[in-house]
Amino acid sequence: AWSEPRAYTPVDAQIGFKLRPARTLLIDIYGGYAYFIGACNMHAEQRYDSESIAYYSLWQNDYQRWKVGANLHYHYRDIVEINVGGNYYFYQQEPLSSIDPESPHFQSANIKGTHIFDRPNWDINARLDVHINSKWSIYSENYFAGSRMAYVQKYPEGASAVELKPIISLNIGGQYAINRWLAVYAQVNDYLNRKHDIFYGYQSQGIHFLVGVKWRF
């Protein structure tokens, strides 16, 4: 008999150092290690008679993740602020723990243990803020990620690892500060309308709009 394990992260540590080569430039370089137990990911099962997805299975596995990364922060007076950061990840997977070892899919599901499904091998965040005056500002907030693999059970081929297209999410917005504590903003997310797979066959929303209020206290 087997049972679903709990999902938790007993270790998630990071160490690094900061450099300030100029008064307006700060560079943060770091490395990290994390160990995940019972981490969840989605596995897609296709229909026998078509390419459509019949259902998704939520599976769990244990894995280790190492990362190296850097962040760059630049500002010019109180007018322009740039933040760029990126990570590269290295994974080591343990056998998938939520599959019945007696299942005929047990061996194929591991697929040599070479992939952590749905997780990117690299990601980049980039944000630009421009303060027009003390009240108005505009910004661009962007996210990129790639080298993601998905587990797909096809018929009659069997299980395989399928590469997902890179994530390119470009967002732009503006903000008006009413006072020191209160501001309103509007944002257009994914203005290229470039949908990506959150997991195989399940796409993101595409272009959409967001309005809100910020309150500092």
Annotate each predicted stretch with a short phrase:
Residues 10-14, 23-24:
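Flexible, glycine-rich linker and terminal segments associated
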Residues 1-12, 35-64, 89-125, 144-177, ...:
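Outer-membrane beta-barrel domain signature, especially the mid-to-C-terminal portions
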Residues 23-29, 78-84, 134-139, 180-186:
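Repeated loop/turn-to-beta-strand initiation elements of outer-membrane beta-barrel proteins
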Residues 18-19, 23, 43-45:
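Transmembrane beta-strand segments of outer-membrane beta-barrel domains in Gram-negative
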Residues 15, 29-35, 84-88, 140-144, ...:
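Transmembrane beta-barrel strands of outer-membrane/channel proteins
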Residues 123-141:
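Gram-negative (and chloroplast) outer-membrane scaffold detector with strong preference
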Residues 15-21, 70-74, 86, 126-130, ...:
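Residues on the lipid-exposed face of transmembrane beta-strands in outer-membrane beta-barrel proteins
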